Swiss-Prot record:
ATP binds at residues 14-19, 71. This is CTP synthase. It is an enzyme of class 6 (ligase). InterPro entries: Class_I_gatase-like, CTP_synthase, CTP_synthase_N, GATASE, GATase1_CTP_Synthase, P-loop_NTPase. Belongs to the CTP synthase family. Pfam families: CTP_synth_N, GATase. GO terms for biological process: 'de novo' CTP biosynthetic process; pyrimidine nucleobase biosynthetic process. The keyword Phosphoprotein does not apply. Pathway: Pyrimidine metabolism; CTP biosynthesis via de novo pathway; CTP from UDP: step 2/2. The active site is at 378 (nucleophile), 514, 516. Residues 1-265 are annotated as: Amidoligase domain.
Length: 540
């Protein structure tokens, strides 16, 4: 019998509901429960796949090929579970489903309304995402008071009434600001946020109060009094310098005990030794390296959330602090590659569109010529191929058809047909819709014996997640192989190139897939660990 924990937020956005939910999930998992996690996003987009990274941050890709909110990345990194498209629903997706049902006549000619049709669809989606787990944590995006969130809040209010207090609880995340001029913390924003939530019909059982410093006991009692929440259920969550400390912070305050008691669960004690080891490794590094990340979304580092975390995970594995130097690829186009001087490795991540692509090509050339370790991901592989074709293989004018309609040498082109892991053929053209029309999700990749990729992974076949429309053009395979480029990873049908290497380089590897989506703080990822070790060796 699944029990539900609904997590809402108030006062301001970006309080860290996703990390709080994921931290609670990993504590409950450590106490022997199976845990599922779902994010409900109020925006009307069907998914974030076509949203600008500056608007939304990273698009996180699941094993089954869903383009989802970046919070699902936090869920997978904290909780040992695999997310699917059933773990992220948007207003657009909910309405799309309801409208399809109306067109099929499933509502028997009735008037389709927010209540009950939209709220029923939300409840059905929540139950589907729960997947019969012992505990289902449901995060409601946005802030209480937003008009977009109202259908979701109404749906969870109804579920609370239907399930009863023994099977669900409500946890509300708020901000308790410190006013420097007054020298005191202010509880009024939290009081008003809970008042707004109660006006909808939801009484929170637990308050998690974000604060920059310790909340005095007197203020906690005041919050409890005005919000009708038990004093012990007013939990402080102070700012920390490392998000992987949060599970221990919440556990020390007994959040998991409060949850277990309110849901009528008797559980064994939690062991958080894994997280203690993670934090200890990050706080006591044996050295440090600096890695240049050359992209065009560097003003908003959330656009590279999983990459940032993957490099930190590799730092945990190697016991080195990884300093990331963000470099705007357009800056390299304007001012040259001086910004790369002194780095221990270069990473070029994925991206879309022509802006800044020549700067990424310059970064790949810099790494190749100066023997600096290089890791290219998705577009980072494509620019490495373009650079090699132009400057080593002598294919003047080599480019991708994504950026130039008719290049002299289209070494990268649109994938018009490929086979999915289920054996079905996907076809696309330049006129296809942008949303959901890429090669998406986990796909097997066969690695060549004796290659760097095979050495790094330690096996012949790996499975990694993809998100791209363009691929290497196999017509140029022989020419580039003759020039010294090695193609060391292939799709399972050997039609698509997945990994390229430069054998005469100390460490140069580029992949079409996104390994950052499967890296976790406790287990890391072999590709990032090997990349950071190469950076350490280069640093000397």
């Amino acid at each position: 019998m699944t029990r539900y924990i609904f997590i809402t937020g108030g006062v301001v956005s970006s309080l860290g509901k996703g990390i709080t939910a994921a931290s609670l999930g990993t504590i409950l998992q450590a106490r022997g429960l199976s845990v599922s996690m779902t994010k409900l996003d109020p925006y009307i987009n069907v998914d974030p796949g076509t949203m600008s990274p500056f608007q939304h941050g990273e698009v996180y890709v699941t094993d089954d090929g869903a383009e989802t909110d970046l919070d699902l990345g936090h869920y997978e990194r904290f909780v040992r579970t695999t997310m699917t498209r059933n773990n992220n629903y948007t207003t657009g997706r909910i309405y799309e489903s309801v409208i399809r049902k109306e067109r099929r006549g499933e509502y028997l000619g009735g008037t389709v309304q927010v209540i009950p049709h939209i709220t029923d669809e939300i409840k059905r989606s929540i139950q589907q995402g729960a997947d019969d787990a012992d505990i289902a944590l449901i995060e409601i995006g946005g802030t209480v008071g937003d008009i977009e969130s109202l259908p979701f809040l109404e749906a969870i209010r109804q579920m609370g009434a239907e399930l009863g207090r023994g099977r669900c609880l409500f946890m509300h995340l708020t901000l308790v600001p410190f006013i420097g001029a007054a020298g005191e913390m202010k509880t009024k924003p939290t009081q008003h946020s809970v008042k707004e939530l109660r006006s909808i019909g939801i009484q929170p059982d637990i308050l998690v109060c974000r604060a920059s410093q310790r909340i005095p006991e007197e203020e906690r009692r005041k919050i409890a009094l005005f919000t009708n929440v038990e004093p012990r259920a007013v939990v402080s969550c102070l700012d920390v310098d490392n998000i992987y400390k949060i599970p221990e912070v919440l556990h020390r305050q007994g959040l998991d005990n409060i949850v277990a008691e309110k849901l009528g669960l008797e559980l064994p004690p939690a062991s958080l030794q894994d997280w203690q080891r993670v934090v200890e490794a990050m706080q006591n590094p044996e050295g440090e390296v600096t890695i240049a990340m050359v992209g065009k979304y560097v003003d908003l580092t959330d656009a590279y959330m999983s990459l940032n975390e993957s490099l930190r995970h590799a730092g945990i594995q190697t016991r080195h602090r990884v300093n990331i130097r963000y470099i705007d690829s357009e800056e390299l186009e304007r001012e040259g590659t001086h910004a790369l001087d002194g780095v221990d490795a270069v990473l070029v991540p994925g991206g879309f569109g022509e802006r800044g692509v020549e700067g990424k090509i310059l970064a790949a050339r810099y790494a190749r010529e100066r023997k600096v370790p290089y890791l290219g991901i998705c577009l980072g592989m494509q620019v490495a191929v373009i650079e090699y074709a132009r400057n080593v293989a002598g294919l003047e004018g080599a480019h991708s058809t994504e950026f130039t309609r008719h290049p002299h040498h289209p070494v990268i082109g649109l994938i018009t047909e490929w086979m999915t892991d289920e054996g079905t053929v996907e076809q696309r053209s330049e006129d296809s819709d942008l949303g959901g029309t890429m090669r998406l999700g986990a796909q097997p990749c066969r690695l060549t014996e004796g290659s760097l990729a095979r050495q790094v992974y330690g096996k012949d076949v790996v499975e990694e997640r993809h998100r791209h429309r363009y691929e290497f053009n196999n017509h140029y395979l022989e020419a580039l192989e003759a020039a010294g480029l090695r193609f060391s990873g292939w799709s399972h049908d050997r039609k698509l190139v997945e990994v390229v290497e430069q054998p005469d380089h100390p460490w140069f590897l580029a992949c079409q897939f996104h390994p950052e989506f499967t890296s976790t703080p406790r287990d890391g990822h072999p590709l990032f660990a090997a990349f950071v070790r190469a950076a350490i060796a280069h640093r000397g």
